[in-house]
Amino acid sequence: MSNAPRHFLDLDEMPTKELRAVLDAGVALKAKLKSQKARNTLREKPLEGKTLAMIFERPSTRTRVSFDVGMRQLGGESIMLTGAEMQLGRGETIADTARVLSRYVDAIMIRILNHDALLELAEFATVPVINGLTRRSHPCQVMADLMTFEEHRGPIEGRTIAWTGDDNNVLASWAHAAERFNFTLRIATPPELAPGKPMRDWIKSSGASIVLGTDPEEAVRGADCVLTDTWVSMGDKDGEHRHNLLKPYQVNTQLMSLAKPDALFMHCLPAHRGEEVTDEVIDGPQSVVFDEAENRLHAQKGILAWCFGAVG
């Protein structure tokens, strides 16, 4: 039996069965927290005595708080290290950082733009490494999104999900999820901000039901869920140009009316109200954005439990 650590790096690298185990664990842990009567298959404090190192290249609120609280609720603890403290790849090598931290802590969560740095950290770490976010992907967010959809609408298999906006890390993880969980993902982006060749090649080779286009109305029509994200991601410098390209992709009541009557609206937050989404939509009855935010905590507890071998 392999002693290799269980890394959580990207959804397309994990079997659907294990991803489902992670989701089920998150649901069970949330139910347990909400009601002591809920059935629970995990030990009371499965991560008692465990320590998670959280590395942040840039400041973060949601990721930091949700992982810290999640570790506490599971009986463990966490410590935070900032990019300024770590000097990843600029002082000590990433490989050496991985080796040293593996001697101190039981798992590492890292939020860093450079995806290759994440992969190098995982290569040399002897403890689980969790992708808290990179420029390439954001699997923790999408696990929370999947959990939220299924809470409200049941199994996502066979459903239609629409994305309107630009190509980014959240969309990449949604594409991976579409292949793993067998649902249709319709993507509408400006031609200038469409998924690049690596993602287009992956979509073609994966056989996933993913439709690329430029018309937001066509993408949203008849969808079970409508997704968007901020138009200017971290590190982007051409904000005004991007805003002009993306104005036709705003999620408003007119666009939402084309989706199914019971369609959900999702946004990973923080939202720029009046830009990618209107107040009427994000505060409306179809919006589940704050359930998504809450479920970051519970989905990530499922991820932590899986990484430590408490589930799956």
Curated annotation (Swiss-Prot):
GO terms for cellular component: cytoplasm. Its main location: cytoplasm. Carbamoyl phosphate binds at S60, T61, R62, T63, Q87, R111, H138, P139, C140, Q141, C268, L269, R296. It catalyses: carbamoyl phosphate + L-ornithine = L-citrulline + phosphate + H(+). NCBIfam families: orni_carb_tr (TIGR00658), PRK00779.1 (NF001986). It is an enzyme of class 2 (transferase). Its EC number is 2.1.3.3. Keywords: Amino-acid biosynthesis, Arginine biosynthesis, Cytoplasm, Transferase. The lineage of its organism: Bacteria, Pseudomonadati, Pseudomonadota, Alphaproteobacteria, Hyphomicrobiales. It is found in: Cytoplasm. One of its GO terms (molecular function) is ornithine carbamoyltransferase activity. Pfam families: OTCace, OTCace_N. InterPro entries: Asp/Orn_carbamoyltranf_P-bd (IPR006132), Asp/Orn_carbamoylTrfase (IPR006130), Asp/Orn_carbamoylTrfase_sf (IPR036901), Asp_carbamoyltransf_Asp/Orn-bd (IPR006131), Orn/put_carbamltrans (IPR002292), OTCase_ArgI (IPR024904). Belongs to the aspartate/ornithine carbamoyltransferase superfamily. OTCase family. Pathway: Amino-acid biosynthesis; L-arginine biosynthesis; L-arginine from L-ornithine and carbamoyl phosphate: step 1/3. GO terms for biological process: arginine biosynthetic process via ornithine; citrulline biosynthetic process; L-arginine biosynthetic process. Reversibly catalyzes the transfer of the carbamoyl group from carbamoyl phosphate (CP) to the N(epsilon) atom of ornithine (ORN) to produce L-citrulline. This is Ornithine carbamoyltransferase. It comes from Rhodopseudomonas palustris (strain BisA53). L-ornithine binds at N169, D229, S233, M234.
